């Protein structure tokens, strides 16, 4: 709980031993081209609503990094992400890995699919709500922040297959420059895969000022 609280803005609330999610995503094509992404989410509450706060997010595409930082306030950094659900191997496992820089592994994940749970449809989408903190500093040294606001958005999955299975996740602690391991795994790991999925980004209709 303390490790998560350190990363959360004061206006957000969390439960004891809050749920933490890790997402590896592979985008076959998008408005910024194909890329891969790693998203680290702390499940919390903001003004009584369940949301996910994103303290760490890595992406393999520079244009996507810039758009996410400037528009939604996500702390996107470039990273080397190895994740391909179509890559065959003799073990029947899906592997995922985040490195920054290349060769310095920060996160390793394994997924062993076991059961098809159903289809995602536009009529019954799966929605993951998230909250970014958009900060723009003052041009004047020591001056007040020009922008400091919470920006809500959501990933709305509208197609694809949902699979359950067994998961394994490890934070290596290899780098204090990208210290993802400071959010330790203290309970069991639940794993789900969205296969051949499509989603759309729900853009915000309003933002919320934050007095940092």
Which positions does each model-derived feature cover?
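Broad gene-expression machinery/nucleic-acid interaction feature
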Residues: 19, 37-41, 54, 78-80, ...
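N-terminal start-of-chain detector that recognizes signal peptides
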Residues: 11-16, 55, 66-68, 171-173
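A short linear-motif detector with a strong N-terminal bias
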Residues: 1-2, 18-22, 35, 60-61, ...
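N-terminal domain-onset segments
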Residues: 1-37, 170, 184, 196-198, ...
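Hydrophobic/aromatic-rich structural module bridging two neighboring secondary-structure elements via a short loop
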Residues: 23-72
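Interaction-surface and assembly-scaffold signal
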Residues: 68-212
């Amino acid at each position: 709980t303390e490790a998560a609280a350190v990363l959360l803005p004061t206006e957000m609330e969390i439960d004891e031993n809050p749920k933490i999610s890790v997402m590896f995503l592979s985008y076959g094509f998008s408005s910024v081209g194909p890329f891969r992404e790693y998203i680290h989410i702390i499940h919390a509450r903001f003004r009584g609503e369940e949301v996910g706060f994103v303290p760490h997010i890595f992406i393999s595409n520079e244009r996507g990094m810039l758009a996410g930082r400037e528009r939604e306030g996500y702390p996107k950094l470039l990273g080397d992400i190895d994740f391909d659900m179509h890559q065959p191997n003799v073990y029947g496992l899906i592997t995922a890995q985040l490195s920054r820089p290349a060769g310095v592994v920060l996160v390793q994940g394994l997924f062993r699919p076991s059961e098809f749970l159903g289809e995602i449809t536009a009529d019954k989408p799966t929605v993951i709500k998230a909250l970014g903190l958009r900060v723009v500093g003052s041009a004047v040294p020591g001056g007040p922040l020009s922008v400091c606001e919470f920006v809500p958005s959501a990933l709305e999955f509208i197609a694809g297959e949902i699979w359950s299975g067994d998961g394994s996740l490890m934070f290596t602690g290899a780098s204090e420059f990208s210290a993802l391991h400071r959010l330790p795994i203290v309970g069991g790991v639940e794993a789900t895969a969205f296969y051949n999925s499509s989603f759309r980004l729900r853009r915000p209709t309003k933002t919320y000022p934050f007095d940092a």
